Amino acid sequence: MAHQDYRTHLTTNHTNMINYIRGIVDELTPTQATLEAHGVGYLLNISLNTYTALQGKSEARLFVYESIREDAWTLFGFATKQERELFLML
């Protein structure tokens, strides 16, 4: 992987355990969504773009990025893979 652009490596090879979550839209605010999948409610931080895409839907699939730190495990949800990749470039 010598000389490979670090950003390209991040976007194409990120090591998420969860690629996406499909489930019932249980709660929705402009900054967070709760998707229930198989009895588990996943709280995801979302963008206004994803919020707009979810409005009025009872079920959805969100692509996920997991931020795992010593003091917190945070999930970010995105309406599209492209939105997630853009987030990873920031």
What is the predicted function of each stretch?
Residues 26-90:
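Long, highly charged, low-complexity intrinsically disordered interaction regions
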Residues 1-16:
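Intrinsic disorder/low-complexity segments
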Residues 16-18, 57:
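A broadly tuned, weak detector of single residues within folded domains
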Residues 18-28:
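Structural detector for short beta-strands of small beta-barrel domains
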